């Protein structure tokens, strides 16, 4: 089963359902990607910060070697980390990430956060994480415009087919669109029934940016990180509304949450270690929720953001 695609403003087709690599363990990553390709996944959403790009590349190389897929059938996404926002740092780190994946180009390369941090030499620590070489949170001086101009040059040099942004506010998107020579193809944001970000989603879509949701299952991904508001929030899988809609359609709560997004044209990037759930997560486009059900799920919005630097004890108040 393959995922339907959405046409990006860059002209390329992007699968509506992909496999997210955040928190995928290094020792299982290659196998998980290989099996996901076998199940029909074609989009893989990685990042420098996830620390598993080498293993992800190994899984892809094996799948290509075994004839499961061709490179041009895959849609590989990675992200520019905060420590590399200076204009002259963008291309070198992108090339390093491409080498880690073992590929010549990214289908989509994204600015991970609208935060410039002080440069950390990859030879000193990689991935660098949030702290500088002094083990402190130190901000850099690069503007978004400087970073975006360097991102555009990646497209010119065919290192990235499309470029995008993540964790940007509507105000930052507005500003970026004033000077962008190449418009961002996508906006990736935390999006689930507890955090619908309706105005931001509508604005991005109106401007022709495809929205991708991460953390579609709400607090679930953040429990093991001991993020307090995630620990305090009722799991969406167990919410009576989500469960009753799932039972009515003969689906799982996870499928309902994913379909709530994809039915509104929002791409999703769930992950699962379970082969059955891997298959189920891909099956979230060929059936429909009723309009009233979508509205009811959206009504669960509580403005609850789980992926916030402040929640990890880092003073970067961007939200």
Curated annotation (Swiss-Prot):
GO MF terms held by the record: D-xylose reductase (NADPH) activity
Site feature location: Lowers pKa of active site Tyr: 79
Catalytic activity: xylitol + NAD(+) = D-xylose + NADH + H(+); xylitol + NADP(+) = D-xylose + NADPH + H(+)
Entry keywords, A to Z: Carbohydrate metabolism, Glycoprotein, NAD, NADP, Oxidoreductase, Xylose metabolism
PROSITE patterns, alphabetized: ALDOKETO_REDUCTASE_1, ALDOKETO_REDUCTASE_2, ALDOKETO_REDUCTASE_3
Binding site for substrate: 112
SUPFAM superfamilies: NAD(P)-linked oxidoreductase (SSF51430)
Signal peptide positions (record): none
InterPro entries hit by this protein: AKR (IPR020471), AKR2D (IPR044487), Aldo/ket_reductase_CS (IPR018170), NADP_OxRdtase_dom (IPR023210), NADP_OxRdtase_dom_sf (IPR036812)
Binding-site residues for NAD(+), renumbered to this chain: 166-167, 215-224, 271-281
Protein's GO biological process: arabinose catabolic process; D-xylose catabolic process
Domain of life the protein comes from: Eukaryota
Active site per the UniProt annotation: 50 (proton donor)
EC identifiers of the protein: 1.1.1.307
Glycosylation sites: 26, 141, 167
Record-annotated disulphide pairs: none
Record-linked Gene3D superfamilies: NADP-dependent oxidoreductase domain
Function: Catalyzes the initial reaction in the xylose utilization pathway by reducing D-xylose into xylitol. Xylose is a major component of hemicelluloses such as xylan. Most fungi utilize D-xylose via three enzymatic reactions, xylose reductase (XR), xylitol dehydrogenase (XDH), and xylulokinase, to form xylulose 5-phosphate, which enters pentose phosphate pathway.
Family (UniProt): Belongs to the aldo/keto reductase family.
Identification of the protein by name: Probable NAD(P)H-dependent D-xylose reductase xyl1
Name of the gene: xyl1
């Amino acid at each position: 089963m393959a995922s339907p695609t959405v046409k990006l403003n860059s002209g390329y087709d992007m699968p509506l359902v992909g496999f997210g690599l955040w928190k995928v363990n290094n020792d299982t990553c290659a196998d998980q990607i290989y099996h996901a390709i076998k199940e029909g996944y074609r989009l893989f959403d990685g990042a420098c910060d996830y620390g598993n790009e080498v293993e992800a590349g190994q899984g892809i190389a094996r799948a290509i070697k075994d004839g499961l897929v061709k490179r041009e059938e895959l849609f590989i996404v990675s992200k520019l980390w905060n420590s590399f926002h200076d204009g002259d740092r963008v291309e070198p780190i992108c090339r390093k990430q491409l080498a880690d994946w073992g590929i010549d180009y990214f289908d989509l390369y994204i600015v991970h956060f609208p935060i410039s941090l002080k440069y950390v030499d990859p030879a000193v620590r990689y991935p660098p994480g949030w702290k500088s070489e002094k083990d402190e949170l130190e901000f850099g001086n690069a503007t978004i415009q400087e970073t975006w101009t360097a991102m555009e040059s990646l497209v010119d040099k065919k290192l990235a087919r499309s470029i995008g942004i993540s964790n940007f506010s509507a105000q930052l998107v507005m500003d970026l669109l004033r000077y962008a020579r190449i418009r961002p193809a996508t906006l990736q944001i935390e999006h689930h029934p507890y955090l619908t970000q309706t105005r931001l989603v509508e604005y991005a879509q109106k401007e022709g940016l495809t929205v991708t949701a991460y953390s579609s299952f709400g607090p679930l991904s953040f429990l093991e990180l001991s993020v307090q508001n995630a620990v305090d929030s009722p799991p969406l899988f167990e919410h009576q509304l989500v469960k009753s809609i799932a039972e009515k359609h003969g689906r799982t709560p996870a499928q309902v949450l994913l379909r709530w997004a994809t039915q509104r044209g929002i791409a999703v990037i769930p992950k699962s270690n379970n082969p059955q759930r891997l298959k189920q997560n891909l099956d979230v486009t060929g059936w429909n929720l009723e309009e009233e059900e979508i509205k009811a799920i959206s009504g669960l919005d509580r403005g609850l953001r789980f992926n916030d630097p402040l929640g990890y004890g880092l003073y970067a108040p961007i939200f």
